[in-house]
Swiss-Prot record:
Record Gene3D superfamilies: Glycosidases
Record PANTHER family: COUNTING FACTOR 45-1-RELATED, LYSOZYME PROTEIN
Record-given protein name: Counting factor 50
Chief location bin: secreted
Subunit annotation: Monomer. Component of the counting factor (CF) complex, which includes cf60, cf50, cf45-1 and ctnA.
Length: 303
């Protein structure tokens, strides 16, 4: 009888864990510029509305986010225990080539700063003057991802159905990594199959479904993973006027092909300081997908 009770308790714990994971599906992301201006009360508000935060740690022009330690600390103190980082690297940006050196520098800095994080997302999108030929770009992105993995980092890819082929052509050798895709359809679900089936991916890990909106007085992008049933939509997410692009630099023009691919997709905020402020082209085909089995909910990167 005791054995049966123990089995029942174990099964119950597993079911409860699954329920907690599925219901905790709302996330936000923002740039390094936005992250340094968030007050303690805003952090608390963001943590009460989301279970996950993704913070920019590297921009092609500005490189390593020197404030990342204090920003991650503020997120932890607010209650976030699922903290991801994203890095926008570009082959033509100073200090970004080769990709292996840029990733090694990034990981070394994170280790020196004692940063605890879950997943590192490699941001792949267009910006003015950031990239070379598609085949060279593909080699660069693959080198970045594989270098990060080789250093013991949990790594995924962020992109969209429009930005991916514009940047890396038909690259499909990274589909075993989690994919976070952008498609601005105001719909926290994975029902938009056509927008994440690119680059060899067939299922997503996370979706950026609203770009450059306002939550708790902070300019953010809205994302979801899991069921998405409790995530905000445009009718309920805004709390004041937006304060600017959630990520990406204010310098540069909207270069990411403003109407390529399907409407309302592409990343609104992750460009580098040297590239476009909205390099993900507000209307470029969406999509960051990635294998659902590697959604970045593990124990974090060991660096």
């Amino acid at each position: 009888m005791n054995k049966m009770n123990n089995i029942f308790l174990i099964i119950s714990s597993i079911i409860l864990s699954i329920v907690i994971f599925v219901s905790g599906e709302c996330a936000i992301d923002f740039s390094s510029e936005i992250s340094v201006g968030i007050s303690d009360s805003q952090w608390s508000c963001l943590a009460s509305n989301n279970q996950r935060v993704i913070i920019q740690v590297w921009s092609g022009g500005g490189q390593y986010n020197s404030n990342i330690s204090s920003v991650v600390s503020a997120a932890e103190q607010a209650g976030f225990d699922n903290i991801d980082l994203y890095a926008f690297l570009c082959s033509e940006c100073d200090g970004n080539y080769p990709a292996s050196s840029a990733i090694q520098s990034l990981v070394s800095s994170l280790k020196s700063d004692g940063i605890n994080f879950n997943m590192l997302w490699i941001d792949v999108e267009q910006c003015d003057g950031c990239w070379g030929a598609e085949s060279d770009n593909a080699d660069y992105v693959q080198e970045a991802v594989e270098t990060a993995q080789g250093l013991g980092v949990l790594v995924g890819v962020y992109s969209s159905e429009g930005e991916w082929p514009q940047t890396v052509g038909n690259l499909s050798t990274l589909s075993q990594y989690p994919l976070w895709y952008a498609h601005y359809d105001d719909n926290p679900s994975f029902s938009d199959t056509a927008f994440y089936e690119f680059g060899g991916w067939t299922s997503p890990a996370m979706k950026q479904y609203i770009g450059n909106t306002n939550q708790c007085g902070v300019s953010v992008d809205l994302d979801f993973y899991g069921s998405g049933s409790g995530c905000s939509t445009s009718s309920g997410s805004a709390s004041g006027s937006a304060s600017g692009s959630a990520s990406g630099s204010a310098s540069g023009s909207n270069s990411g092909s403003s109407n390529s691919g399907s409407s309302n997709s592409g990343s609104s905020n992750s460009g580098s300081n040297s590239g476009s402020s909205n390099s993900g082209s507000g209307n470029s085909g969406s999509s960051n997908s990635g294998s659902a089995s590697g959604s970045g909910t593990g124990s974090g990167s060991s660096i």
